């Protein structure tokens, strides 16, 4: 430890991440970083992805296009995360992560957990202390809400991070209840 400052790893060990739940619209949340359940193209889509791009404005899409051109020509891989500006959202950054499509034939839970771990890693790299997550993969990607909530909460609790507060922003009462059951 030089000059009394802590390394990011030491800070991550010192912080216990608080988990809060909100029922509502993630695009109306105030946080250092808002996580987008993106599609691999990073160019917007349906659900949370479309809402974030619409409310955040053209700056988010412009950043996403730059990322596609410079690093992710074939798209962002499932389970990975990358940050852009937050545009007009009440945040400093949007962290885009690509969740897996649910499959009854193949266990993809590790890919879903990776979305949360990688998003927190990116948040740490940015210096974000508050992060708002949607229920990744639980919408149009068909992941059963109870299982999506279990994986999300267990992963956030198990991940070493300097993020002080994670807020799960759930779109309806059943989603909120599924996450509340896991947080208890």
Label every PLM stretch briefly.
Residues 1-184:
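Macrodomain-like recognition of ADP-ribose-binding/processing modules
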């Amino acid at each position: 430890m030089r000059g009394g400052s802590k390394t990011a790893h030491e800070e991550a060990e010192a912080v216990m991440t608080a988990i809060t739940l909100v029922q509502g619209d993630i695009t109306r949340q105030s946080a250092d970083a808002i996580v987008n359940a993106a599609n691999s193209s990073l160019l917007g889509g349906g659900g949370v992805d479309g809402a974030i791009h619409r409310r955040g404005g053209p700056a988010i899409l412009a950043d996403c296009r730059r990322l596609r051109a410079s690093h992710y020509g074939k798209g962002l891989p499932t389970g990975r995360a990358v940050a852009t500006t937050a545009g007009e959202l009440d945040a400093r950054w949007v962290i885009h992560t690509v969740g897996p499509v649910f499959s009854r034939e193949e266990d993809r839970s590790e890919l879903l957990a990776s979305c949360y771990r990688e998003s927190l890693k990116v948040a740490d790299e940015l210096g974000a202390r508050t992060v708002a997550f949607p229920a990744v993969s639980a919408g149009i990607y068909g992941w059963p809400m109870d299982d999506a909530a279990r994986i999300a909460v267990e992963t956030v609790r198990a991940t070493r991070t300097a993020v002080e507060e994670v807020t799960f922003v759930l779109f309806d009462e059943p989603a909120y209840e599924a996450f509340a059951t896991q947080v208890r």
